[in-house]
């Protein structure tokens, strides 16, 4: 029902946020290593 829908949406949003955060984190680490910040 509606609860499953909300749970599915939350999981999808969580995945997207985690992916974006991971990408940003990697870019931050890379620029720190190369002193390009």
Swiss-Prot record:
It is found in: Secreted. Disulfide bonds join 31-37. One of its GO terms (cellular component) is extracellular region. The keyword Secreted applies. Expressed by the skin glands. GO terms for biological process: defense response to bacterium. Has antibacterial activity against E.coli and S.aureus strains. This is Esculentin-2JDb. It comes from Odorrana jingdongensis (Jingdong frog).
């Amino acid at each position: 029902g509606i609860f499953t829908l909300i749970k599915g949406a939350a999981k999808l949003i969580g995945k997207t946020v985690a992916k974006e955060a991971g990408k940003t984190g990697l870019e931050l680490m890379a620029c720190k290593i190369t002193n390009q910040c």
